Amino acid sequence: GVMHGDLTTSNFILFKNIVYMIDFGLSQNTIKPEDHAVDLRLIKEILNSAHAKIMESSWKNFLLGYKSVVGIAYQTKIVKLVSEIESRGRYAQVV
């Protein structure tokens, strides 16, 4: 699959009620689940820091959309890896 490489809210646009992901300049094809987890960890961190008031609902909706693309099994695996990444010493836990 594709790892975006800079998955921030600045790289999403809304056009005619459809959300599009843009700016794939840092993207790469990868089969490593951890690469995808790093992408999700970044968007989660951005939601928490820049959009704290809507973080929980935004994260929930993001994961629903993610699941619709990758399937429940892969989404579950990646979310677990996000938690593992957050537990590493250099990352602060995000709600």
Question: Which residues does each predicted region cover?
Answer:
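Catalytic-loop of the protein kinase fold
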Residues: V2-T9, L14
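Conserved catalytic motifs of the protein kinase core domain
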Residues: N17
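C-lobe/activation-segment region of protein kinase-like
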Residues: Y20, F24-V95
